[in-house]
Amino acid sequence: MYIRFFLIVALFCTFTTYAYEVKRIRRHIQKPVSPTKDSFYVPKEGWEKAKPGTILASRKIQAGFTERRKIHLDGAYQLLYRTSGVDDKSPSFTVTTVLVPKNARTNKLVMVMPYEDSNFVDCAPSYKIQLGAPNEVNPIQSVEELMWTSILNDGWILTLPDHQGPLSAFSSSFIHGHASLDALRATLNFDTLKLQPDDPIVGIGYSGGAMAGGWAASLHDSYASELNVVGWALGGTPSNLTGTFRGVNGGLFAGFSVAGIAGLVDSYPEVNDYIGSVITPAGNDALQYTREHCMMGIVVGLQNVNMTLDSFVSNGNTLLTDKKIAPLL
């Protein structure tokens, strides 16, 4: 009992200290613009003709967690790049954030696919990582920052893709995989880093990031075989989306099942039509909720929601067995 009490107090003090440090730093900086309002996230006309991995725009940024954790960087950059959507014939685009530590080892690259787990565009890692962004510090993100910090302190160049794409399509497998692989291409193409095309690469992901990593690993040979990926480290991987949906639906983390459906609806017109034909107003409200809240908001706001109830859809337990959606799971 006492151990639990002191652990809670320690976590509270740590988080409070971080929050105070962020507040102190924010007094001296300009708040970043959210992706829905930032023109950087919109490629210029003709971008579709570029090859996957082509850099469409770049900029320097300030990263919030490196300021708080006193990590000294040579530079922090964001790259808008061409990628592919649900197949390699569907042009798309997204952003990756590249962090370069002091005295970086310029012959290796590490990619971490953050667990965004939300359908809200303004929850993109590239936005939340920027100094001064709302919700820049929260308990879940702070845990992931520990891994980023360790990688940077070891001297590795780190790239963090917005692997859910421009619509933040959580659970849309091919979008996750393509965006991750093309983030590597774009990072290698960024001349400032002086990386070489055959430099060894490691990909890391947990939870929603592991889903992206799993699909990137699966698509590597067919989509981006030139990349010298020497290993993947993935944990908490939702490898079977149907099983994951059934496991979390109606429980504490039910919001993830709703977000997963919303991601497929936003990616595939046929799924949009199918779900539109069976969903109720309450179900539609639940989907929309995931497009307006970040991960913690989804977990709290949609706790215990059961998407197979008649109040949400008209076809209950057969929701995911229809031929329009089953092959995508």
Protein language model regions, located:
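Conserved alpha/beta-hydrolase
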Residues: 114, 129-167
